[in-house]
Design a protein with these regions (language model features):
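Gly/Ser-enriched beta-turn/beta-hairpin loop segments
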Residues: 30-49, 95-101, 139, 153-172, ...
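A conserved glycine-rich beta-strand in the N-terminal activation segment of trypsin-fold
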Residues: 2-10, 41-65, 87-90, 114-117, ...
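C-terminal recognition in membrane/secretory proteostasis and scaffolding
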Residues: 10, 190-191, 204, 230-358
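Gly/Ser-rich catalytic serine loop of serine hydrolases
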Residues: 50-53, 115-120, 171-188, 277-288, ...
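N-terminal activation segment of mature serine protease catalytic domains
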Residues: 1-35, 51-53, 125, 233, ...
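Terminal peptide-recognition signature
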Residues: 20-22, 38, 54, 64-68, ...
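Conserved active-site neighborhood of the chymotrypsin/trypsin-like protease fold
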Residues: 58-142, 299, 303-309, 314, ...
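Active-site loop architecture of trypsin-fold serine endopeptidases
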Residues: 31-32, 48, 76-79, 113, ...
Length: 358
């Protein structure tokens, strides 16, 4: 009988050469008043601002493609990839997506000796062995951590680099050590297949300034490989992810006072969650309904809408052109409308938690 350790070692060898470190640089200014400033050198320089991992998943002619996290390369004006051989190469961004926190880079394929393969994340089971690596980026590159699949479909709230809510994500939970530097790297099974892309870890519960905050260990999260494949294919083909939109501006009902809920929205007291329509754009598909300012959306496509995060999750579960049923309160009355979803008018896919365009 082959031990788990032996299987893990074989799996590591299958993917070792495809795992890379990703380093992002941005311009910084020294702010000093020097002779160089007087002669045209402002003192700006490229500084490494972020480091994570990535995995080479495809070679096409002279080009190799790397998947990593969007937050690793976001805002960078230069990206470099450190191969398992120790060679550092320039990378360019093919496309990135803040909602899924995924990005695709391309590099010269001449130095690429190994490419990873994706497994089917729908087929994983709780308790199965999971492997991750590069816990602190390039300093500990090509190292390996081992754990299990703790949960297949864990729903968590997601924010971008500015702390803005971008919705909710269904992720794989694992106790394989996930640390700074793991971001963007692969979570693999014992067959050496990528079953997820490591994205984040939960280090504490509650507010960091709260006395009730509790330190947490062994809770890492990875984006399921089936979702990864869908997203990166779109990024390579279009440079972005195409998502549907409603063409409206919204605010969480949580931000509305009890008095305004009753007097302005005419909302029944039993309705305690939802999103308030603040504006319907001229090109919005909702123009064909009577949904208007101060209406409260409580359901989309059969899924409860408790706030902006859950609305985005429900909305992004559909495609452009889909017709969905929206349930909403209009002047205190619960109504329904069928709406055909249109193309999102911007590529940012992010907005403030208190006021959002969707």
């Amino acid at each position: 009988k082959v031990s788990v350790g032996t299987q893990a070692s074989k799996a590591f060898k299958k993917i070792k050469g495809a795992v890379v470190s990703v380093e992002a640089y941005s311009n910084s200014s020294s702010g000093s008043d020097t002779l160089e400033d007087l002669f045209g050198d402002s003192g700006s320089s490229e500084t490494s601002t972020s480091e994570g991992s990535g995995v080479i998943y495809k070679k096409d002619g002279n080009t190799a493609f790397v998947v990593t996290n969007n937050h690793v390369i976001s805002g960078a004006n230069k990206v470099e990839v450190l191969l398992s051989s120790g060679k550092k190469v320039k990378a360019s961004v093919v496309g990135h997506d803040s909602v899924s926190d995924l990005a695709v880079l391309k590099i010269d394929a001449s130095n690429v000796k190994q490419v990873a393969t994706f497994g089917n994340s729908d087929n994983i089971n709780v308790g199965e062995t999971a492997l991750a690596g590069s816990p602190l980026g390039s300093e500990y590159a090509t190292s390996l951590t081992q754990g299990i699949i703790s949960a297949k479909k864990r729903t968590i709230d997601v924010t971008d680099s500015n702390g803005t809510s971008t919705g909710q994500a269904t992720v794989i939970q694992t106790d394989a050590a996930i640390n700074p530097g793991n971001s963007g790297g692969p979570l693999i099974n014992l067959a050496g297949q990528v079953i997820g892309i490591n994205s984040m870890k939960l280090s504490s519960t509650g507010s960091s300034t709260s006395s009730s905050s509790t330190s947490v260990e062994g809770m890492g999260f990875a984006i399921p490989s089936n979702e990864v494949v869908s997203i990166i294919n779109q990024l390579v083909q279009n440079g972005k992810v195409v998502r549907p939109a409603l063409g409206i501006s919204l605010v969480d009902l949580d931000y509305v006072s009890e008095a305004d809920r009753s007097q302005t929205l005419n909302l029944p007291s039993k309705v305690t969650s939802g999103v308030v329509v603040m504006k319907v754009n001229s090109s919005s598909p909702l123009k064909k309904t009577d949904i208007s300012k101060y209406d409260v959306i409580v359901s989309l496509g059969g899924k409860k809408v408790s706030g902006l995060s859950s609305l985005r999750t429900a909305l992004y579960g559909h495609k452009v052109g889909d017709t969905v049923e929206i349930q909403y309160y209009h002047k205190g009355e619960l109504k329904k409308a069928n709406v055909k979803l249109t193309l999102e008018s911007n590529d940012k896919n992010t907005s403030t938690a208190s006021n959002s365009g969707n």
